[in-house]
Amino acid sequence: MWFGFAFDILARPPIVRGMFRLVIFLFLLCAGLAPLGAQSSAIPEFKSRLPMSVVFKGSEKFDRLVKRAKKENWAALPIGERTAAVGKALLGTPYVNYTLEIDDRIESASVNFDGLDCWTFYEISLAFARMLQAKDGDYRPEDLLALVELERYRNGKCDGGYLSRMHFLEEVFADNGARGLSVNPTKELGGERLSRQIREMTAMWKSYRYLRNDPSQLPEMARIQEKVSALPVYHIPKSRVASIERHLRTGDIIAITCKYPGAYTSHVGIAVKKPDGVWFMHATSKRDKGRKVILDCRISDYLKRSDENYGIVVYRPLELPKPVDVAMEKGAGR
């Protein structure tokens, strides 16, 4: 029966055969069996709970970055080199703090190219780099927002609540690692275990717009801090960093550990390998450095600038799986 039907279709005029193929494709598409080409990517769908004008700032800069990335074929670079290429393109961007505090109650992934802090600098550089690999052209702000959400929120999903965002780098590293999005080679590089009692968010809650407007979230934030305090966090003491620099890679995310007993880390940036060592690219708040994104100096030299700099954590992002919904793979907040 089916063979006869197939031969009957083949005998029809080309327009009829074309319509038949379209019907079959649409059927398979609805069944989730048809390939979508570039659309069948690792980029989850982004659904904003706030207007795009609120969650995405700097569209012209985004368009310029996309144009440059295509011209210089950044998509062909390994993930680390790609992340660093994006970071270098953002050099000179002004340092601006609290850019994630965009509403009194509703939480959403957001991107602001007009101003970056140390965390959003690495985060946007990485998300943009992943976007270039996860999709073949037609890059949209929604794609970047989706990949920021994948990195920034617990299990890769923002539920509209402030506490779905991870507010501590250590949790981001653990959560993304558990979902197969990164590795943490710090321990293998000779790292030592750190012990901290995290309390930054509850101690400084009035500094955060969402917590000021809804203090009822403080008890749950305290519970999150307890969980982060219990994570197995390793760091490489600054006295040893120069000796292990050769093992670092361009695009590694470098978190600076601190001596303060209420926090593991105080700063973060991107590693860039140069002939004379591995340099630290970061968004700095220092006025003598211009309060902007800079390619500073060797990481080991940067650590020597302050007694508060205790060491480093090395976080190595990986390429996104394709086309697996990594956001839903259960894993393990500034």
Where are these regions (language model features)?
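Boundary at the C-terminal end of the N-terminal hydrophobic targeting segment
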Residues: 36-40
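Bacterial N-terminal signal peptides
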Residues: 23-32
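Acidic/His-rich structured neighborhood in mature extracellular/periplasmic domains
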Residues: 90-231, 273, 282-285
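Cationic-aromatic interfacial patches
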Residues: 42-120, 125
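Short, well-ordered loop/turn sites that connect or cap secondary structure elements
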Residues: 247-248
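C-terminal soluble interaction/assembly domains
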Residues: 254-320, 328
